[in-house]
């Protein structure tokens, strides 16, 4: 876990290689979440791309002071990004405000 935190710190300082490494190491996490949404009528590769956006947001927003694993923090952001896409891409547009 210390190695992951160090990699995240380097990514926050602008190290592109560290960011790429985090993305590569967490691709299986994104795929496991994409499988949950496999019966929604969308191509898995499309959902993977959307989930990857959530992963990148998690990398950028993760605070190393949090006492949680990175994957625990990233999962809700990845799921949220996919759900937002499914909601906004649907045939019926529903306003989020009341």
PLM regions: where:
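Alpha-helical promoter-recognition and RNA polymerase-docking modules of transcription initiation factors
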Residues: 1-92
């Amino acid at each position: 876990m210390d190695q992951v935190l160090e990699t995240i710190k380097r990514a926050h300082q602008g190290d592109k290689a560290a960011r790429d490494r985090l993305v590569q190491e967490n691709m299986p996490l994104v795929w496991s979440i994409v499988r949950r949404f496999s019966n929604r009528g969308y191509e898995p590769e499309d959902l993977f791309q959307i989930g990857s956006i959530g992963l990148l947001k998690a990398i950028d927003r993760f605070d190393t002071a949090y006492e949680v694993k990175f994957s625990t923090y990233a999962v809700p952001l990845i799921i949220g990004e996919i759900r937002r896409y499914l909601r906004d891409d649907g045939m019926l547009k529903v306003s989020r405000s009341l």
